[in-house]
From Swiss-Prot:
Lipidation (N-myristoyl glycine): 2
Spans annotated as G1 motif: 30-43
UniProt cross-references to PANTHER family, sorted A to Z: GTP-BINDING PROTEIN ALPHA SUBUNIT, GUANINE NUCLEOTIDE-BINDING PROTEIN ALPHA-4 SUBUNIT-RELATED
GO biological process: adenylate cyclase-modulating G protein-coupled receptor signaling pathway; chemotaxis to folate; G protein-coupled receptor signaling pathway; regulation of aggregate size involved in sorocarp development; response to bacterium; sorocarp development
Subunit structure: G proteins are composed of 3 units; alpha, beta and gamma. The alpha chain contains the guanine nucleotide binding site.
GO CC entries: cytoplasm; heterotrimeric G-protein complex
Full protein name: Guanine nucleotide-binding protein alpha-5 subunit
Chain residues that bind GTP: 35-42, 170-176, 195-199, 264-267, 319
Organism, scientific name: Dictyostelium discoideum (Social amoeba)
Region entry G3 motif, spans: 191-200
GO molecular function ontology, one term from the record: G-protein beta/gamma-subunit complex binding
Role description: Guanine nucleotide-binding proteins (G proteins) are involved as modulators or transducers in various transmembrane signaling systems.
Amino acid sequence: MGCILTIEAKKSRDIDYQLRKEEGSKNETKLLLLGPGESGKSTIFKQMKIIQDDGGFSIDERLEYRYIIYGNCISQMKVLVTAAISQDLKPNNPDNETRFEKFSKISPGGNSWTLEIAEDIKQLWSDDSIQNIYRMKDKFYQLNDSAAYFFDNIGRFANENYVPTQDDVLRSRVRTTGIQEAHFKFINIEFRMLDVGGQRSERRKWIHCFDSVTAVIFCVALSEYDQTLREEESQNRMKESLMLFDEIVNSHWFRNTAFIIFFNKVDLFREKIAKIDLGDYFPAYTGGLSFDNSTQFIKKMFLDLSTGNQRIFAHFTCAIDTANIQFVFHAVRETLLKNIFNTIINY
């Protein structure tokens, strides 16, 4: 009996040690966050800052996002106005004609922000022509997922004492270029997470991140099954995700690496799948406008790509929902513990 307890205690100590150990002297578990552009990777990355032990963005850190948020408001209204003009839509309110002209020429960065610009955005967002063109998003033009959130909150942003909230920070968008790195502790385990640019031009920078990875978290935007790439408008976004996952999961770099798929933007997908049939873009799907049927079909498409023996775990996520990501990351932590336990007992 004492011998069994000693063996079990040793295994427990080994698991604890291995989970904290990375190659060399670093006491961290290395997570590689991969996926195509706009799959929600960077939002997941920011969530880690919030859900970590004693986490969250400080006031000073949130203030640094102000001009990013201002820039998001301006750039997304410019997209809408440009799309409206291209479709020959005129503003309902004659006063907005000059605003159409202004936003067709405006520089989209946060440096263009003024209280007058904030009022322009408020008036344009309430115009029927802009609302009509907004409903055409994903068909004729590409708009960020959080555009409506920013427009709805424009009055708050215009306050001279405005301090971004955690939600504002999560919804803000800056294209990831190169490699972003963060160190955080979650339930007493040290993690090192690397977020790399998802656009095609950024993927060549991934290669040197592949060494000593404990797990790959691969993000897929469920809601983009009917959308095309910004870089190549003839390529379906979900098909691009499938191609990328196929390349990564079957790479020799990851033969012994755990894979965790985050099927992200589940909230947007639930709204869209009730109106737009997945079968229009993936003819093998015959499950109709069913959320359950469509999510299981998509999940199977990805899981079937693996030709190796890796264990692949899947979670349906909403990256802007902190409670959801905290719940999912508890499961991810348990997955890593079990993976290391299985490695030790099979050693």
